[in-house]
Amino acid sequence: ILVGIVDSGVDYFHPDFRNEDGSTRILRLWDQSVAGNPPENYVSGTEYTKEEIDEALALGETEGRRLVPSGDFSGHGTAVLGIAAGNGRASEGVKRGVAYRSDLLVVKMGNPRENSFPRTTELMEGIDYLIRQAVKMRKPIVINVSFGNNYGSHEPYN
């Protein structure tokens, strides 16, 4: 089973997203905020593979983050993914997520606009990407999108 998130990114160095041998559980990470090598059928961002993330992990944090410069500056995506699928390595198995044995897919949404959020189209592309990856891998997927809004009237009679 795959667990996918569209969120603020992920700290891929976090132990809960690594296997016992230290390799990553993240099969793909699409960072929409980093220009460079977008996934097939998309025009923005950079896609990182499991192999690239494993190479970054082997280099250590300083050098590794140069190779795969994707992060989670707010921590929200990392927390969400941990609740959904963290394996508990950081807490010796005490604090693990719901689907702690699953493989992971991550979409980090693009940079927010001034006084705003990333575009809705980026969110939709992220969901589309996750579904396409699951189909390609022939695996079922659960997708978490932890975004909401407060649109519309807030008067008591509207």
Language model region names:
Residues 1-121, 137-142, 151-154:
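Subtilisin-like serine protease catalytic core
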Residues 144-146:
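Active-site neighborhood of phospho(di)ester-bond hydrolases with catalytic His/Asp-centered motifs
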